[in-house]
Swiss-Prot record:
Catalyzes the reversible phosphorylation of UMP to UDP. It is an enzyme of class 2 (transferase). NCBIfam families: pyrH_arch. This is Uridylate kinase. It is found in: Cytoplasm.
Length: 226
């Protein structure tokens, strides 16, 4: 079974080597259990810091996007090197390169591809290209909520929802500025819908239980395409 794992840039912001160790062992466990895994990394605070500085001196959005892409690729290299023999030793810079690297039978790790496109959209595209029926979005909360649980304490996790439900939740909260993409953007939603890809949103601090989460035995949110 093929799956794509989208790792939030916030994973890298914690500067916690244990995160990388747990990720490596989780990928090893998935591989042992018959999964083919692709990984897409976000840019995190590295991307935001460079984008902020560049925006303040008047650099245009397309160039800011490039800074974010390069930051996400730096994170991809970190993950790729940490996986050692599990990974194919190349970070693809386009969908075509991803497809070629995927054919080698190892874990492929990538960051962003092109300006105007979030790493969530990249994750949806590579899920589609690799015939993966599940896209796992690993972020710093347990799943999807009606409002941001880091801001509001009275919100409940939504264990099951559709892409249409997700659109309503995200309505008005999405920005197209470089460095501001969250969860799934409209393009990512369209891609998972057209290829009927299930999305599992989970906490990256629970990667060591990812197989249980994929089985529905742990807390997460499952988004079904409509």
């Amino acid at each position: 079974m093929n799956i794509i794992l989208k790792i939030s840039g916030k994973f890298f912001d914690e500067d916690n080597v244990n995160n990388l160790i747990v990720l490596r062992e989780s990928i090893r466990e998935l591989t042992y259990n018959g999964f083919r895994v692709g990984i897409v990394t976000g840019g995190g605070s590295t991307a935001r810091r460079y984008i902020k500085l560049a925006r303040e001196i008047g650099i245009g959005e397309a160039y800011l996007d490039l800074l974010g892409i390069w930051a996400s690729r730096l994170n991809a290299y970190l993950v790729m090197f940490s996986l050692q023999d599990l990974a194919y030793m190349h970070v693809p810079q386009s969908l075509e390169e991803f497809i070629q690297d995927w054919s080698h039978g190892k874990v492929v790790v990538t960051g962003g591809f092109q300006p105007g496109q979030s790493t969530a959209a990249v994750a949806a595209l590579v899920a589609e290209a690799s015939s993966s029926k599940t896209l796992v979005v690993a972020t710093n909360v347990d799943g999807v909520y009606e409002k941001d649980p880091r801001v509001y304490t009275d919100v409940k996790l939504i264990p099951h929802l559709t892409t249409q439900d997700l659109r309503k939740i995200l309505e008005g909260s999405q920005s197209v500025q470089a460095g501001t993409y969250e969860l799934l953007d409209p393009l990512a939603i369209k891609i998972v819908e057209r290829s009927k890809i299930r999305v599992v949103v989970m906490n990256y601090r629970k990667l060591n239980r990812i197989i249980n989460i994929l089985k529905g035995e742990e807390v997460s949110s499952i988004i079904e395409p409509t």
